[in-house]
From Swiss-Prot:
This is Tryptophan 2,3-dioxygenase. The lineage of its organism: Bacteria, Bacillati, Bacillota, Bacilli, Bacillales. Homotetramer. Keywords: Dioxygenase, Heme, Iron, Metal-binding, Oxidoreductase, Tryptophan catabolism. Heme binds at residue 237.
Amino acid sequence: MKENEKVIMEKGIHTDFKENMTYGEYLQLDSLLSSQKRLSDHHDEMLFIVIHQASELWMKLILHELNAAIESIKQDKLQPAFKMLARVSKIQSQIIQSWDILATLTPSEYIEFRDSLGQASGFQSYQYRMIEYALGYKTPHALKIYEKDPELHARLHAALHAPSLYDVAIQALVKEGFPIHKDVLNRDITQPYEEDATVEAAWLEVYADVKKYWNLYQLAEKLIDIEDWLQQWRFRHMKTVERIIGHKMGTGGSSGVSYLKRVLDQRFFPELWNVRTKL
């Protein structure tokens, strides 16, 4: 071996793994990296699969953080929740960037393998559905999509019936002494949240006296961050779909771009947006 080809190996580097776990074993890379099964011979289908699988991994982490944050807020541990929610926002920014990679797929390339997808669609992503549930956008009718898998259906049913991030945030307002209407506190949490004047009045007071309600103010801003990022993700999703398939119907049966444009108007924390006008 020539002098300039020598590999410098530090003395402490481990090389014997006969009885020790390797990096690949820890991450179960054999399983992870063998999960990209193309259904066509088209080169670009690999891009399509990897982008969506990577997004699902990020969504798994988002759910991990959201659920932990919800539990922390329930227990009045707001500071740890702030860290978790900040991490969610960082993950969201990462997922948004992935649309730039998928956008390198042209209409001519996608049409070569689109039929291989059958009726499979991102609309069926159960993790995305659970994220919506965790944020308070409850859609009971969507459970029908998951009836094929009883175990998965049960998990989504449980998520539908669990308090959302906004539910526990409103409870935090109550614990601070704000008078929230009983209809809000006793509402059916399996239904989409509807804005309420008493909740808006409470958040308005929080924003009007930040020093007094610093933790609630920080919580509110973390929620706004998450919804802001989610709306940006939805917009990039819509524009990427429009760029690749135009206004064709989605593989899952939706109206495609028209549907994605409509969901841009959905809000998770309406009062937090309203107070910005009223301050």
